[in-house]
From Swiss-Prot:
Function: Catalyzes the last two sequential reactions in the de novo biosynthetic pathway for UDP-N-acetylglucosamine (UDP-GlcNAc). The C-terminal domain catalyzes the transfer of acetyl group from acetyl coenzyme A to glucosamine-1-phosphate (GlcN-1-P) to produce N-acetylglucosamine-1-phosphate (GlcNAc-1-P), which is converted into UDP-GlcNAc by the transfer of uridine 5-monophosphate (from uridine 5-triphosphate), a reaction catalyzed by the N-terminal domain.
Gene: glmU
Entries under Gene3D superfamilies matching the protein: Hexapeptide repeat proteins, Spore Coat Polysaccharide Biosynthesis Protein SpsA, Chain A
Quaternary structure (record): Homotrimer.
Residues where acetyl-CoA binds: 381, 387-388, 406, 424, 441
Protein name: Bifunctional protein GlmU
Pathway the protein contributes to: Nucleotide-sugar biosynthesis; UDP-N-acetyl-alpha-D-glucosamine biosynthesis; N-acetyl-alpha-D-glucosamine 1-phosphate from alpha-D-glucosamine 6-phosphate (route II): step 2/2; Nucleotide-sugar biosynthesis; UDP-N-acetyl-alpha-D-glucosamine biosynthesis; UDP-N-acetyl-alpha-D-glucosamine from N-acetyl-alpha-D-glucosamine 1-phosphate: step 1/1; Bacterial outer membrane biogenesis; LPS lipid A biosynthesis
Cofactor annotation: Mg(2+)
EC numbers: 2.7.7.23, 2.3.1.157
Length: 457
């Protein structure tokens, strides 16, 4: 049985923020959410988040998540004291296979594979996640005995000169038998330079009790990087985005510049996808085979089918784009926009909660809201569906093969029949019959002999 305890009680003073540190985002998600996500991959019986500063806000951010519980650390007296607060909620069976894994809410990128390796490294005892650093200043040092076995961890402030020369450091992440961990937590003291209860002291207690202590290392150095300041947050953001870019490149995606690419959610790409510079992908985004995304586009919760093109500076949110459709440049698809195959949505066109079926086009300067547009429809420049009467929204229906002239207003609810034509400048307030020309503008006239006024001297 596996328990996971995540320490998330810290103030984060150096963040200079009223927001609890673990709620600051990395790749569009709270740091704590990354840790919980990795923990869930291990299928634990219980996840316990130890909260302190901003406890109510942290709880509210994750309220209702299954298998998630909270323990309060108030005041904060160190990492050992933090885990002590979770002890009453730890699930325990009958043997050494009952394990508690301790993670940190401000070390957001530790990967499930690394945690699996750590659990395997403990055997029937304890395991710590360690790393070798060129500059180990500030970290707890891993002290090994003559046989190379981990015998204790000493914090930097309590370390001797010889111990400070050690390059192998403690990441803070460990796994231990639950029953023994409870016992060791009851035996640690605050007799140290900080006057705190260190979780690391359980290693010395384990060795004293004859319990073997193993060690594992992360798959990548960025996995154990913590965040204590805005600078570190920005550095870790770039490290993670670089990793996400590498994964896309290895999967066959072409990135014009991997250093100018941001994923703040999940991006799934088919074959031969091209992504230009400065693009941001949020939520869940799917790009089909051969999709091309132009520079500086933002896609949030979007599905783009094969062969489609998203041109420069377009913003798409909760939208669907059909095969070989073209969007942009400078287009905006709002929630509920659904473009059929080979449809075109051009510059300065906004579409919201509307369907544009195959081969239809709205190439310039239009607003299409709450509309159902059939196939092979041409929507002229300056067209507006007037969908809101000040209280309620109404739908516009434009059937197949209709032609909507420029500068037309369609006052919903209204229907344009199949093959109908609306003359430029029409304000449509009644249904337009199929196959007919409907026009509402005044008849053009010329005033003979009219002259412009002359400016008086």
């Amino acid at each position: 049985m596996l328990n996971v305890v995540i320490l998330a009680a810290g103030l984060g003073k150096r963040m200079q923020s009223d927001l609890p540190k673990v709620l600051h985002t990395l790749a569009g998600r709270p740091m704590l959410d990354h840790v919980i996500g990795s923990a869930r991959q291990l299928q634990p019986a219980r996840i316990i988040v130890v909260v302190g500063h901003g406890a109510d806000r942290v709880k509210a951010a994750f309220e209702g998540q299954p298998g998630l519980q909270f323990a309060l650390q108030q005041p904060q007296h160190g990492t050992g004291h933090a885990v002590q607060q979770a002890v009453p909620q730890l699930l325990e069976g009958d043997g050494e296979d009952d394990v508690t894994l301790v993670l940190y809410g401000d070390v957001p990128l530790v990967q499930p594979a690394t945690l699996q390796n750590l659990l395997q490294a403990r055997g029937r005892g304890v395991a710590v996640l360690t790393e070798v650093l060129a500059d180990s200043t500030g970290y707890g040092r891993i002290v090994r005995d003559a046989q190379g076995q981990v015998c204790r961890i000493v914090e930097h402030k309590d370390a001797s000169e010889a111990e400070r020369a050690i390059k192998e450091v403690n990441t803070g992440i460990l796994a231990a038998p639950t029953a023994r961990l409870k016992d060791w937590l009851g035996r640690i003291t605050n007799d140290n330079a900080q006057g705190e209860y260190y979780l690391t002291d359980v290693i010395g207690l384990a060795v004293g009790d004859g319990v073997p202590v193993g060690a594992a290392q992360p798959g990548a150095s960025w996995e154990t990087l913590g965040v204590n300041s805005r600078v570190q947050q920005a550095q870790l953001e770039r490290a993670w985005q670089s990793e996400l870019a590498r994964r896309q490149l290895e999967a066959g995606v072409t990135l014009a510049d991997p250093a100018r690419f941001d994923v703040r959610g999940t991006l799934s790409c088919g074959r031969d996808v091209f992504i230009d510079v400065g693009c941001v992908f949020e939520g869940t985004v799917t790009l089909g085979d051969g999709v091309r995304v132009g520079p500086h586009c933002v896609l949030r919760d979007v599905a783009v089918q094969a062969g489609a093109r998203i041109e420069a500076y377009s913003h798409l949110q909760q939208a669907k784009v059909g095969q070989e459709a073209v969007v942009g440049p400078y287009a905006r698809l709002r929630p509920g926009a659904d473009l059929g195959e080979r449809s075109h949505v051009g510059n300065f066109v906004e579409i919201k909660n509307s369907v544009l079926q195959a081969d239809s086009k709205a190439n310039h300067l239009a607003y299409i809201g709450d509309a159902d547009i059939g196939a092979r429809v041409n929507v002229g420049a300056g067209t507006i569906t007037c969908n809101y009467d000040g209280v309620n929204k109404h739908r516009t229906v434009i059937e197949d093969d209709a032609f909507i002239g420029s500068d037309t207003q369609l006052v919903a609810p209204v229907r344009v029949g199949k093959g109908a034509t609306l003359g430029a400048g029409t304000t449509l307030t009644k249904d337009a019959p199929a196959g007919q020309l409907t026009i509402s503008r005044a008849r053009q006239s010329t005033i003979e002999g009219w002259k412009r006024p002359v400016k008086k001297s």
